[in-house]
Amino acid sequence: MTPGTPRNSSDQSLASSVERYLQDKGKGRGGDGGNYRRNAARELERFVEWAAADRGADDWTGIVPDDVDREPTFDDLDERVFREYARHLSGDRGLKQNTVQTYYRYISAWCGWCVNEGYLEAHYAQRASAMAPLPEDDGRKPGDQQAWTSEQRHALTRHVDERARDAVEAYTTLPEDTDPLDKQRARYAALKAARDRALVFVLAYTAVRVGELLRDPNDPRRRGVRWEDISLDDGSMDVYRKKQQWDAASLPDPVISPLRSYRQLMDPPTERWPVFPTFDQRTLAELVQDELADRGERPEAITECREEYARDLLLALDEEIRPPSITTDGARSILQRLSETAEIDIDHPKHDYLAPHGGRRGMGEVLVRAFGYTVAARYLDNSEEMVRERYSHIEAGELGNVATEALNEIDSIPADDTDRN
C-alpha cells in the first residue's frame, strides 16, 4: 500500500491506530520505552477522548454526527476537526503557548503517520486553516534559556571541590582506633561529596546532555554512564547520544582529576558499576534486601549483615550489588541542594538554581565565543545550523560591536565639523 492510499478507514478505530503509531515511534525493545512515546501516548489518548466527547467543554458532543451512535473513525476526521482541537488546546486548558504548540505537534505527527499508513488521504493537521487557532510563538529568544556564567561555574565547582576535599581528608585522617561504624560514616560522606563534585565538573565542562549521562526510567537504553564507558587516560567517555547511537564525548582536563580521585575512593567492584550511583537510602535498602534474598540469605541473616554497615551503599560495594544510576530528576535535586549551599547568585525567571542543561549551554557559549560555531557544533554534538540558531544572541551582540567600531572608524563626525555649524 502506497502512502495516501486509503484503507477501509471506517473499520479502523482511532485508538487502535494510536497504539500502532506508538509502537513504531517507541524506543527500546518492543517499542515500549522512550520519553517521546510516553508523552505522545498521553496527548493522543486525550485527543481520542476528546473526539469521542469524553473530554472537552460541557457542550462538546464529539466529532461523530449526532444521529449516529458509534466510536469515532477516520471517516470523521478532516481539517475542521483538527482546527477545533487546536482551539480546544489553546483556550480550554489554560496551557502556555509553547506547551500548546508541543501538544499539537504530537497530534500532527500522528496525523502524518496516518497518511503514510493509508488511514487518511491528506495531512489535515498541517493545513493552514487547522493550525490557525494555535497561539503565536511565545517570543522566547535563544539567549533566554539558562546558561551558567563563568562566575557561576567557578563558584559551583570551587564549592563542590572544597566540600569533597574536606570530606576526603576527614575520612583518610581518622585515627586507627576509630569505631568501624564511624569510619564507615566518614567514608560514605566522602563518597557522596566526591560523587557530587565529579557530577558537577562533568556537567560544567563536557557539555554532555544530562539525559546522555544519567538514567532515564522511561528508556531502558539510557541506564547511566558506567566506569567501563570512561577512559581517563584517553580523556573520553562513551555516551548514548540524543541521535540514538553510541558516540565518544571528550573529557577536558578539569574533569579528569575529580573523576580519578572519586574512582580511587569508591574502588568499584566491577567496570559495570555506575559512575553516578544513587545514594537514596530507600532504593538501596530494597535493592540490598532483594539481592541478598535472591542469593539464598535468610531474613535474619540479611538484617544482621545490614546492621554491620552504616549505609547500604557500602554493603552493596562489598557484596558487588550494583545500584542504579541516579536519574535526571536526581541530578536536578542535587544541583538544587548544591546551588543553595554554595549561595550562588541566580537571576533567572524559570530556575532558582543552576539547572543541569545550563552547564551545557554555558559551555556552548564559551566555545562559540572562543572558537566559533563550527568547533562548538562538533563539541556540542549538534549541527552548525542549530548552534547558530541557539546562540544567535552572541553573534547579534558581536555584530553590534562591529557596527559600533565601524561607525567610530568611518562615519564619526569630527569635532571641528560640529563647531562650524
Question: PLM ranges: what are they?
Answer:
Residues 215-309:
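Conserved tyrosine-mediated DNA breakage-rejoining catalytic core shared by Y-recombinases
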Residues 298-378, 385:
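Short, basic (Lys/Arg/His-rich) helix/loop patches that form interaction surfaces
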Residues 380-405:
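Catalytic-site neighborhood detector that most strongly recognizes the C-terminal catalytic loop/helix
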Residues 107, 199-200, 207-216, 222, ...:
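Alpha-helix N-cap/helix-start motif at helix boundaries, enriched for small hydrophobics
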Residues 4, 65-68, 120-178, 394:
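Flexible interdomain linker/hinge and immediately adjacent N-terminus
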Residues 19-35, 42-144, 186-188:
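N-terminal core-binding DNA-recognition domain of tyrosine recombinases/integrases
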